[in-house]
């Protein structure tokens, strides 16, 4: 993918959740909620502070992150759906 986010924005690809319950019931797409986890695909250079210096982002490409249900702007690139969001919209990095 060739896209470079600007400033403190990141590109996130949603992680697909299991579409089947523990008892084996398949959940249709219309009833399934969109996942609130994703993988960072690209990061911007950082946010410019009041002193004029650029503060690098804390997240990096490959990080698995947790974000709010309505975070980011959905975009399609070459048929794939991604989210463009600010670093501050990310609630945490999933480790391990």
UniProtKB/Swiss-Prot annotation:
Compartments, as annotated in UniProt: Cytoplasm
What Gene Ontology molecular function terms does this protein carry? ATP binding; metal ion binding; protein folding chaperone; protein-folding chaperone binding; unfolded protein binding
- Could you confirm whether the keyword Cytoplasm appears in this record? yes
Where is it predominantly found? cytoplasm
* Residues of the signal peptide: none
Transmembrane in keyword set: no
Q: Which GO terms describe its biological process?
A: chaperone cofactor-dependent protein refolding
A cellular component term from Gene Ontology for this protein is: cytoplasm
NCBIfam families for this protein:
PRK00364.1-2, PRK00364.1-5, PRK00364.2-2, PRK00364.2-4, PRK00364.2-5
What family does the database annotate?
Belongs to the GroES chaperonin family.
Q: Tell me the protein's name.
A: Co-chaperonin GroES
List the source organism: Nitrosomonas europaea (strain ATCC 19718 / CIP 103999 / KCTC 2705 / NBRC 14298)
This protein's encoding gene: groES
